[in-house]
Amino acid sequence: MGISNNTMLDVNDLNHYYLQMIKEIKTKEHLFLVLEKDTFINECLERYGYWEKPTMDICRSYLKSDSSVIEVGAHIGSHTVILSDICKDGFIYSFELQKLIFQLLNANLLLNTCKNVYTYMEAVSDENKIECIAEIDYQTMDKFNSGLGSLKVVRQHKGYPINIVSLDNKFSEIKKLDLIKIDAEGHEIPVLKGAKELIKKFKPLILTEFDLKNKQEIINLLPEYKFEDISYNYELNNLIYPNLMFKGTPR
């Protein structure tokens, strides 16, 4: 199963959320627990058996069985379980900052026997500190996309404390790194700034989402990388919801 470095929700939280909000989705190869009213990822898993297949196809073609991956924004683990399968002799280091989503991530790693994944309920940036971030109450929502959750600092009494870490500091002793995969909902630049030493040392493949505001800034930040826009559309409503994605390779 996945190896978590954080305390799980207490029993009351688990009973409250799991009994009222969770459903099971079975695909051809995997089993997932998801929030029942979540939108895109759930629907894609149910219809197609995967989420963002083009991204996973790139991972399959590039990674080896002993590869190591850092995944920033693992969500419920729809990519994580596949990365675990691909890199069966390597390690996956997955970050997810949303408290409830982090619990689902760990549950899905357990259900799919992912023994090579380490999980962290921490935010990734270019600094190291503790902040209080907003907690999303999904129970009060009708339909939502929990994949849009991002770092939002609030006053202490309105949220929960979380470690903010840089990848350079977190993994200063790591011996191997083949891929950095980032889904940080507009926070990609601080994540990359905080990983510049790792990138310089290991020259990993970089798969990162971007938005139109930071596209050129990502390119400028790492001139030693060639960034290819591999944007594709979600399988559902694919004319409305573009998924903007960079593939970065060392020059």
Language-model regions: role of each:
Residues 74-76, 99, 126, 184-186, ...:
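Short, glycine/acidic-enriched loop or turn micro-motifs at the edges of active sites
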Residues 81, 106-107, 132-133, 192-196, ...:
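Short amphipathic alpha-helical segments
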Residues 110-115, 199-202:
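Short helix-capping segments at alpha-helix termini
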